[in-house]
Amino acid sequence: MCMPCFTTDHNMAKKCNDCCGGYGKCFGPQCLCR
């Protein structure tokens, strides 16, 4: 799991994805890696 996802950050989805190495998704407040 990566950093928490903040809905106020418009780049959050990309940051989550990058953190997971290209396979991340924001699910509620959590950044989940596949």
UniProtKB/Swiss-Prot annotation:
It comes from Mesobuthus eupeus. PROSITE patterns: SHORT_SCORPION_CHLORIDE. The keyword Transcription regulation does not apply. Toxin with unknown function in healthy organisms. Suppress growth and migration of glioma cells and decreases the mRNA expression of annexin A2 (ANXA2) and forkhead box protein M1 (FOXM1), two key molecules in the progression and invasion of glioma. May affect chloride channel. May interact with MMP2 and inhibit its catalytic activity. In vivo, is not toxic when administrated to mice at high doses. The presence of a 'disulfide through disulfide knot' structurally defines this protein as a knottin. One of its GO terms (molecular function) is toxin activity. This is Chlorotoxin-like peptide MeICT. GO terms for cellular component: extracellular region.
